[in-house]
Design a protein with these regions (language model features):
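Short clusters of hydrophobic/aromatic residues that line enzyme substrate/ligand-binding pockets
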Residues: 14, 22, 27-28, 86-88, ...
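Alpha-helix N-cap/helix-start motif at coil-to-helix transitions, marked by capping-box chemistry
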Residues: 102-109, 164, 185, 189-192
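Solvent-exposed, polar/charged alpha-helical surfaces in well-ordered, non-transmembrane soluble domains
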Residues: 32, 36-39, 43, 109-112, ...
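Acidic helix-start/capping segments at beta-turn-to-alpha-helix junctions
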Residues: 58-67, 136
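Conserved, well-structured interaction surfaces
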Residues: 77-155, 177, 182, 197-202
Length: 202
């Protein structure tokens, strides 16, 4: 008896949830949870790996050859200098672009999770009823399209170049473990579909 009570209390001790985390089923029980989830997506997008640097003034501008780093360069701009020199397989560049790719897909997954959950909830859960529910849904759909568009412009050529080749997947379900890559035209059609849907909802 003592052994079983020790084991059960040990099991409880091992299953402690950190104070800054919440289970999904708890998060999506309230309108406030949905607001927090959407704010979490915006927060992730503002990180250095995405729009806090790489997709605004960092990597994206280096790819466009906007900077002149020959005058002054330090450790924080090493990856940008490598990109300016077209050294795409350099370890500094690969680690930065891998992190960017991973965070972008994680943000898309979070959007899809919000979309999937908010659609099944009653509007009475939200302060503004349908207006707030639709705003959360519309923003998540629009963000999904926006992130896909940036991934497409980074990892695929212009639509007129190799129109039948596939480049990136378009992920609109959660969870998604394996997704087939699509052509540029297919991705653009899905981006436009999502943007139109988001506009009609909001």
């Amino acid at each position: 008896l003592l052994g079983s009570s020790l084991l059960s209390s040990c099991d409880d001790w091992l299953n402690v949830i950190p104070s800054d985390q919440i289970k999904e089923e708890e998060l999506f029980k309230t309108g406030n949870g949905f607001r927090n989830a959407l704010n979490g997506v915006y927060r992730q997008l503002s990180m250095r790996e995405l729009y806090g640097r790489n997709l605004s003034w960092g990597i994206i501008e280096s790819l466009g050859q906007v900077y002149d780093l020959t005058v002054a360069s330090d450790a924080s701009t090493k990856d940008m200098k490598r990109l300016l020199d077209y050294k795409y397989k350099d370890n500094d560049v690969v680690s930065v672009t891998d992190a960017m790719w991973e965070k972008a897909w994680n943000s898309i997954a979070n959007c899809n999770n919000i979309i999937q959950n908010v659609q099944t909830k009653d509007s009475t859960l939200f302060y503004g009823r349908n207006r707030e529910k639709n705003m959360i849904l519309g923003e998540a759909i629009a963000l999904r399209a926006y992130i896909h568009l940036d991934l497409l412009r980074l990892y695929a050529p212009a639509p007129s170049t190799h129109p039948t080749n596939v480049y990136i997947p378009y992920v609109d379900i959660y969870p998604s473990y394996i997704s087939n890559r699509k052509t540029v035209e297919e991705c653009l059609s899905l981006i436009i579909r999502d943007l139109k849907e988001a506009q009609s909802i909001m």
